Each structure stands twice: as C-alpha cells, then as structure tokens.
C-alpha cells in the first residue's frame, strides 16, 4: 500500500457543516455524522499507518474503533439508535457486514460506521477482508470488494449543458468504478422506458424530463433520483458539474426529501446509507 493518500476528512467535515446549516431537516443526522467524523478519521489514519491483517480486521476494529463509535452515537444520535447500539452483538455485526449478510438497522449502522473508514484506508487490499462472492450479477458490484453501489456520480464535463462520465461509489469500501449512464446500476436494465430520473424542487419532486412550475430553483440542483422500474431500485445521483463543492457521500445524507419521494414510488436503494436511508 502506498504511504501517501489524500485525506478526505476535512472536506467531509466542512461539507457536513454547510449542509446542516442549509437544510435543517437533515440537522439531526448531520450532527451525528459530524461527531462520528473524528472517530472515523482516527481509524483511517491508524489503518493507513499499520494495516490490520484481513483475518484480524473484525477483532481489530471491535477493540480499537467500535467503542468510540458507540460513545459518539450515544452522545449525539437519536435516542432510539443510541439505545439500540447498546444492545448489539457488535463483533458479530462486523463479521456479518464483511460477509455481506443481511443485518438489522442498528447492527448495519455500527458495522458501517466502524469498518467503513478502515476499508477505505486499505484501498485495493480491502477486498481481501470481504466476502467477494456476493450477488448473482457480479458486473453490478464493486470490483474491489464486491460491495453494493451506494451512489451514482456524474463527473464535471467542463460544458454547462452536459454532464461527464458516470461512476458508482461502493457502500462497503468507498472504491469507485465506471458505469454506463444508460443502464440501471442495480440490475443492468438498459431499456430507456424502464429507467426514470426525478429531481427535487421546492414544490415537490418532478420528472427531470419536464414538469414543475419552472419558477422556483431546485432545492438540490445537483442531486436526483436515478430509478429503475424493473428492479424497483434507485440511487441518489450527484452531478459534480452542477456543484463542484459537493462531497457525494455527505450530500446523500442531506437528500432526505429525495429518499422519501423514492419510497413513495415504491423504490428502495440497493443498500441504505450510513444513516439508514
């Protein structure tokens, strides 16, 4: 592993603070996220400096990261989550998440909050700590750890009326990989009629292909729902050309109106984000 890595934590911290001030409806979740960030940053640095062996990762994280995650959650999280994490079989949750097992929301939150920064620090070696045989269609999974996609990201193209190429962000190790804009990232569906895109406006979500009052600016000009009626899955899609300051994994946490609208349409994400949405 290279000893040099660009730390993502300052940008995440700054963006979370900005979005918390801008979107009060996401304040509780972003407050918890801001309290978690120092814990995750410390885990990232320690894993970069002395990477744990893959077979030792659950025990390493349970001893050295998990207690601080629980402390931060009890201090700043919603009461129901704080109570739930106290009763979790934490190391079992960590093992299960690395294996791709279905976990209840509190276990999944603890595992992601604890292991996410460590796997991100391990980079290409993260896959050796994970079950890489997950899912029937391997082409839709992370090439590093075979985790599920969390976000769709459109790169800035340099042109005001066009977006750049698309990549997906892994929910497990934070790696990214290329994906065609004309397919569903969850199931590979390519028929245009089965793929839907919705953007958020002050008066409610509308089709990105038309509709709305045309007078009020979007609440999330750089975010939209990319959904599929074949598998009933969706991802939040971040257009970096519309907001170069966006930090995709942070901006997704503030996109609650989009998630609620998608749920009303019968859509679910391949996997919930860190905060369960």
Where are these regions (language model features)?
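N-terminal alpha-helical interaction blocks
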Residues: 1-132
């Amino acid at each position: 592993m290279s000893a040099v890595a660009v730390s993502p934590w300052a940008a995440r911290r700054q963006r979370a603070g900005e979005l918390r001030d801008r979107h009060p409806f996401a304040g509780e979740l972003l407050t918890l996220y801001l309290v978690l960030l120092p814990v995750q940053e410390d885990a990232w640095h320690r894993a970069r400096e002395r990477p744990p062996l893959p077979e030792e990762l659950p025990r390493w994280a349970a001893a050295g990261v998990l207690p601080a995650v629980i402390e931060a959650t009890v201090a700043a999280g919603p009461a129901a989550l704080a109570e739930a994490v106290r009763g979790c079989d934490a190391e079992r949750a960590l093992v299960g998440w690395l294996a791709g097992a279905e976990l209840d929301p509190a276990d999944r939150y603890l595992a992601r909050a604890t292991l996410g920064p460590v796997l991100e620090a391990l980079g290409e070696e993260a896959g050796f700590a994970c079950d890489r045989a997950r899912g029937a269609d391997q082409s839709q999974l992370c090439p590093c750890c075979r985790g599920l996609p969390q976000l769709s990201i459109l790169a800035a193209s340099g042109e005001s009326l066009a977006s750049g190429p698309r990549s997906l962000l892994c929910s497990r190790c934070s790696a990214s990989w290329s994906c065609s804009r004309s397919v569903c990232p969850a199931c590979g569906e390519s028929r245009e009629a089965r793929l839907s895109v919705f953007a958020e406006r002050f008066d409610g979500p509308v089709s990105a292909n038309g509709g709305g009052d045309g007078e009020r600016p979007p609440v999330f000009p750089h975010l939209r729902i990319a959904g599929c009626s074949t598998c009933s899955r969706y991802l939040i899609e971040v257009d970096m050309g519309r907001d170069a300051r966006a930090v995709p994994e942070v901006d997704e946490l503030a996109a609650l109106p989009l998630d609620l609208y998608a749920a009303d349409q019968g859509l679910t994400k391949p996997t919930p984000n860190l905060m369960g949405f």
